[in-house]
C-alpha cells in the first residue's frame, strides 16, 4: 500500500514503532554510559583542579544519571533524526525532501560544534574569570551538582544556538526570509540575542558577555549564508529564463 494511503491508525502504529526504537536505543546507550560514568565525570571536570564535593550519597547517583542521560541524548540524536526523517519523508514532495535532507547533516554538525565550543572555550574562560574574582578572599568549594549545572548552562544553550545558521539557510532556501530582512532587523536581533544570553546563562555579566559575542557572530554568519543562497537562487532563476 502506498504511504499516502495509510490510515491514521497505521500512521500511529508506525509512529509508535519508531518512537519505541528511539527509546530502546536511548536506554541502551544510557546503560552503557552509566557503566563509564566515572570516566565521563573526570572528563567533564577536567578544567577544575580542585576536588568537587557532594552533600550526600544520593548526589553521586544523580550526577551519574545526569551524565549518562546527556551522553545518551547526544549519541541517540542522529538515530532520532533518522527516524523522524523516515516518518515524514513519504509525505513530502521531492523538492521539499531534498531541501530538508541537505540540512540534516549540517544541523547535527553545528550542534556538535556548539557543544565543543561551549565546553572547551566558553566554560573554562567564564570559570577562570569568576573564580579569579574571589581569589584571596574566599575559599572556593564547589559541589559537583553546582559545577555540572554550570557546565550544562554554558554548553547546551550554545549547542542549540549554533543551529541558527542552519535555520536561516533553510528559511532562505524556501523563500520565507532573505538577507535584506535580516539586515533591516539587525539591531532588534542583537537585542533579542542579548536577552536570550541573559536568560540562558548563569546570572553574571561575564557569562552574559561570553554568550552574547558568539551569538552576534553567528547572526552575522547567518546573514552571509543567506546572501550566498539568495545569489545562487537568483543566478539559477536567470539561467532558467535564458533557456
Which sequence ranges carry the predicted segments?
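Membrane topogenic/interface segments and analogous intrinsically disordered interaction regions
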Residues: 1-243
Amino acid at each position: 500500500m502506498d504511504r499516502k494511503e495509510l490510515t491514521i491508525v497505521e500512521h500511529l502504529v508506525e509512529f509508535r514503532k519508531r518512537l519505541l526504537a528511539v527509546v530502546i536505543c536511548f536506554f541502551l546507550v544510557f546503560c552503557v554510559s552509566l557503566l563509564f560514568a566515572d570516566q565521563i565525570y573526570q572528563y567533564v571536570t577536567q578544567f577544575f583542579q580542585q576536588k568537587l564535593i557532594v552533600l550526600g550519597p544520593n548526589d553521586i547517583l544523580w550526577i551519574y544519571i545526569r551524565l549518562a542521560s546527556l551522553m545518551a541524548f547526544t549519541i541517540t540524536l542522529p538515530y532520532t533524526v533518522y527516524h523522524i526523517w523516515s516518518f515524514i519523508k513519504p509525505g513530502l514532495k521531492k523538492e521539499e525532501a531534498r531541501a530538508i535532507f541537505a540540512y540534516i547533516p549540517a544541523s547535527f554538525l553545528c550542534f556538535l560544534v556548539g557543544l565543543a565550543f561551549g565546553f572547551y572555550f566558553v566554560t573554562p574562560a567564564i570559570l577562570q574569570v569568576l573564580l579569579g574574582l574571589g581569589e584571596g578572599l574566599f575559599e572556593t568549594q564547589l559541589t559537583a551538582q553546582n559545577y555540572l549545572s554550570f557546565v550544562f548552562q554554558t554548553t547546551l544553550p550554545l549547542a542549540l544556538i549554533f543551529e541558527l545558521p542552519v535555520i536561516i539557510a533553510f528559511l532562505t532556501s524556501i523563500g520565507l526570509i532573505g538577507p535584506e530582512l535580516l539586515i533591516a532587523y539587525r539591531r532588534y536581533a542583537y537585542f533579542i540575542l542579548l536577552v536570550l544570553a541573559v536568560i540562558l546563562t548563569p546570572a553574571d555579566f561575564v557569562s552574559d558577555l561570553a554568550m552574547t559575542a558568539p551569538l552576534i557572530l553567528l547572526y552575522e554568519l547567518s546573514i552571509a549564508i543567506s546572501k550566498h543562497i539568495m545569489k545562487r537562487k537568483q543566478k539559477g532563476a536567470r539561467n532558467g529564463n535564458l533557456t
